[in-house]
Amino acid sequence: MADVDESDLKILEILRKNARTPYTSIAKELKISEAAVRKRIEKLIKMGVIKRFTIDYELENEIRAIVMVKTNPQIPTPEISKKIIKIQGVEFVYETTGDYDILTVVRGTNISSINKTIDDIRSLQGVLSTNSTIVLRVWF
């Protein structure tokens, strides 16, 4: 991140909170031109700092769970992570340190759909065990 300066970090923070923030609003807050904001964002995309623009959403009656995954050390964790992210219902996959190698966030419309997603994760070669917890509230 050597080419990322303080203004870039401020832009990233603004976009993290609301990816739809108009460039004019960002420019006004940072006291720079709209063209400068546009160039900086293009640079951040080209550098791979900004991976994608997305939305956070919450549907009524939707359930989220955190699923921690312990993996077989003989199978590279990234191989397993790449398979997990393709499973229906998996929203995020994080490789972590500690007792578990992977932490995932899964979404479903009911407990059965969450359970199916967890079963799909457990069925992958290299997954030794999982530990799941239901999310009660999400704060943005």
From Swiss-Prot:
- Parts of the chain that traverse the membrane: none
For biological process, the GO terms are: lysine biosynthetic process via aminoadipic acid
Superkingdom assignment = Archaea
Places the protein is found: Cytoplasm
Q: Keywords of this protein's UniProt record, alphabetized?
A: Activator, Cytoplasm, DNA-binding, Transcription, Transcription regulation
**Main location group:** cytoplasm
DNA-binding region per UniProt: 23-42
**Recorded GO terms, molecular function?**
sequence-specific DNA binding
Entry's InterPro entries? ArsR-like_HTH, AsnC-type_HTH_dom, Dimeric_a/b-barrel, HTH-Lysine_Regulator, HTH-Siroheme_Decarb, Tscrpt_reg_AsnC-like, Tscrpt_reg_AsnC/Lrp_C, WH-like_DNA-bd_sf
| One Pfam family here | AsnC_trans_reg
Pathway(s) annotated for this protein in UniProt: Amino-acid biosynthesis; L-lysine biosynthesis via AAA pathway [regulation]
The HTH asnC-type domain extends over 4-67
One Gene Ontology cellular component annotation? cytoplasm
Q: What does this protein do?
A: In the absence or at low concentrations of lysine, activates the biosynthesis of this amino acid via the alpha-aminoadipate (AAA) pathway.
Subunit structure of this chain's protein:
Homotetramer.
Q: What is this protein called?
A: HTH-type transcriptional regulator LysM
Species in which this protein is naturally found: Sulfurisphaera tokodaii (strain DSM 16993 / JCM 10545 / NBRC 100140 / 7)
